[in-house]
Amino acid sequence: MALAVFVCGVIASRPAGATDTTPLTGDIATAARAVEAMANPSAVNPLVEFPADFNEVTNRKPVVVTTPDGTKRAIDPAGGCSGPAGDTEWDFGPGCRAHDLGYDLLRYAEHKGRPLNQEARKVLDARLARDMHAQCDINPRGHGTRCHATAQLYAAGLEFNSWRQRWGPPGHEPVLAWGFGSAVVVFLLLARLPGLPRRKEGDREPEPSDTPRPRVTNDRYATFLRLAALGLVVLSQSLLTVLHWAGVSANWLWLLTWALQAIPVFYFAGGHANLTSWHAVQADHGGYGRYLSARISWLLRPVLAFVLAWLVLPLPLELLDVDKSRVEMFGRLIAYPLWFLGLYLVAVAATPVMAWLHRHARLVTPVALVAVMIVVDALRISLHWRTGGYLNLVLGALLLQQLGFHYADGSLHRISRKVLGALALTAVPVLLALITFGGYPRTMMTLPGEGSSNLSPPTVCLLVLGLAQISLVLLLRPRVTGWLAGHRQWRVVEYARSAPMTVYLGYLTVLAAVIGVLGLLDAPAAFDWVATRPRWLTVLVLLLLPVLLVFHRFERNAALSPSRTRETHRTRLAVTLGAGYGVLGVLGFVVTGFAGAAGTLLVFKVDPLQNLIHLLLGWYLLHTAHAGTCHGRRPWLLTALACVPPLLVLEPTGAMVVLHGATIAAALLAAIPKQYQARTTEHRQPRPALQHP
């Protein structure tokens, strides 16, 4: 476990490599020739190959020395070996100083705007390895074997560090943040290993046998809608990809996206489930902490398994010499759809507040959300306001969830079929008018070859389409409900219902393997591609089965552990921080991918290692609230510890300092034991907890 997590941390900390393959020119070409001269020393002065402004740009003053073999070497007098023994007793110093100057050439090229390719750093590292072994032959000092072993150790450490930096320009990295962060990842996982204390007896609420628990109302049609919408998202992405391979033009595919875009229906049906669960928790005398810990824990668990798997996967891919640019594209491709889950976590967390608004302002709330979305969309277009797109994502999810609330309380059932039909039919001319005269994109999903879509970022067109889809599903409700009354049909739905996230994440896994590993999108030949390569069909089937089994195990185990804990201020703090950091981790991977490149999520500067820590911290805090261990001191001390690595980066942003500093302060306060906590627990009248619906 610890070894796997360490590998995750190493891979997550790796920066993205350079991918520019255009010919070198000017000072960059001169720097490349200088590197070549450094890697192949001769009797010629290598400084004649250096760029004219090298000393000024790098603030270095290289000198030339003559080695015992008669070659001239350019060195950095201030350099030296960075190993634990320094230049060593065999004097590896000249080779290390020449190597340091070669690294300065790599930094010079990066400063000029065009990093040299991987081969430049590889030849410099190989030159240093040969120099150290040559020094052992020239001056073994009576310990030739030990000298060669030391040289080999230095060379291995050098190669590992270059591999970790993707053989790109060497830079000053937050090694302390990386090492501390990897340790925190290990601690967060070890805190959940079997055999460790889970909860105190005083934290568990007894379950009286004579007190019945309230049951969640089961709307078969709403359950079917959630699963069908999720399945349609899967099928639509696969279908559009296959059609693109077949060479179908985007001029035809855009119409298909109108019928296949099912995300609005999913959030609509999810709103019904969220409101029903919240009401059930309230009826069971529970609160926000119990609701959120039960509702989000089962979502984050399979997501965490998915992320850990895909953080480790680039290692064997690179060992198999898979093209680096493809691995990086692969990481971003499989991480991007996680926004769908991250946004759903936001909607789940906002349910209690939105339910209060639904109770006190039933009609005003959705109308206000629509108005704000229209204003934000107009500002986004006119001011090129990128953040407006993110804001509309959240507002759109909350609006569709709010409509799901109206379905849950029966309000939408009172709308006549004629009105629903008119709304559905009116959407078509409205969409055509918005696309023709409003300048909106014509596609409702991202398509290859299309510059933009109404999904990324979400626009008014997606809102109109969502309202039309909801009208259609309400029209179909009586007929589909009758069909779902059949025993066989409902058994299929119940089986899929037990692990909906497993289906979604399993699909992402297989899609990523097809596109990223096999590189199908790089060379779409023809529609008969699958038929001409039957061996890949076998590979995909063998890949799909274990993936689904593993993810299903994570999700099934999470669903079988209902909450039986008392709810306190610590519980509510744990679930609030857990949900927030869980969303930050999931959406952070959407921005950065798994390839090691940093990115910006709103005002937060994130990288894959920070994303992993945030996701693990969110999962851990939600688990402590669910299991009742958040009343102890250890979870809060570990929470404070987990917030330290983001503060150790070279240039932490103000937003990250405020977020993690405030979390550390809150965690340390929560770690202080209360004087009368035991007495409060002893006199509290326990109530039965609600099992997750």
Regions found by a protein language model. Give the residues of each.
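Extended terminal accessory/targeting regions
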Residues: M1-D210
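Hydrophobic alpha-helical transmembrane segments of polytopic
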Residues: A2, A222-L232, L256, I263, ...
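Alpha-helical transmembrane segments of multi-pass membrane proteins
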Residues: F6-P15, L232-L243, L311-L315, Y581-G593
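Sec/Tat-exported extracytoplasmic proteins
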Residues: A85, D100-E110, L128, M132-N139, ...
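Individual transmembrane alpha-helices with interfacial aromatic-anchor signatures
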Residues: P170-H172, P337, T532-V539, T653-A662
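Membrane-interface capping segments at transmembrane-helix boundaries
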Residues: A191-D203, R479-W483, V550-S563, I672-R684
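Alpha-helical transmembrane segments and their immediate juxtamembrane cytosolic regions
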Residues: P206-R566
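Membrane-interface extramembranous regions
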Residues: R566-L690
